[in-house]
């Protein structure tokens, strides 16, 4: 399903089922249809009950692809009848298989379906077009021969997918982001149960916005500037669960960063984004005033002001600055370094440096106990706050600075140990996409503290 480019493995004949003893011959003839149409297919699922999911690869952006789609569907429907099977083994009929229901069940039974439908729903209000009186197979296509993939300007490198537009189109609509009982994707959908706040809903909204299919009241809103898109993306936590759990690896966190970058350009960057994006620099300043600021953080009036200015709920406790930073407590062990002792560099993230240095000190102790000499990295930010807030031009500048500091360590082949997963994600995934060339080199040397030992 995770195919790049315009040809996609799509679901329209994916639920056929026959008696298990007939499955081999059925699939052989099914694949003959696929190959005769000059394409391939993905196959998976439940062979033991005679229901293999076959998803042909079709480019629905061309008239030839649409004809191919319709022809395959018709031939497969006839094949199912030949083998005495079912066109819908477990997924239901809906719009995509509705046009074949009379062929599958016969005119008499089909008219019985219609009678029941008209008796209980004379106005056709409930799920119109499903099962009976369905529109033509090609009448509700997401794409079509007149569809043009949008090519919006992007800050990240989306060359792998053929641009930002095609990266958004990677969403296949399978709906794994709508699960509620397992995994992490998608936390906002798990809470709201609203399609708009699922990864699929957001991908569809972005696609519609980029193709001009949304109604815009303000000329500034055309494309990715629409407030509707902002509202749909607002609850995205940028946790990147979709990047790992989505079958096609949709990276909604990156799309949100791209959107915010464009949106701020059109509408102005709010104070909240500026402050949270520059939290590394502000933490350095705040540390100098820790004795004054720390007592304020627990004051109700200060929290209320914080909620008004930054949107941080007044009930949320705020981290306090440590009296002494990690770097001020660090003891450099290079002077006592034994010959041939493997050396690692501990990345000095913002939180560990200014708020909880004990985490960094404890990690260093563990690494030393494991036989490593530990050096402390420079006081640079991974760029995650800027990226998350959509300040991508600033993020690129920060990435260049961070890259210049980390490159000597990376060139020496020295592992860089990180304590924060979000920092690792930024250094390994985002910075190489914002930059080019040597950024790939430092990415290969970064390891999360909970990863296997660098020796491994």
Annotate the PLM regions:
Residues 38-44, 84-86:
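A short linear hydrophobic-aromatic micro-motif
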Residues 48-53, 92-98, 380-383:
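Short, conserved phosphate-binding/catalytic loop or strand-edge motifs used
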Residues 449-456:
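Conserved small/polar residues in nucleotide/adenosyl-binding loops
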Residues 16, 20-30, 34, 61-83, ...:
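Phosphate/diphosphate-binding loops
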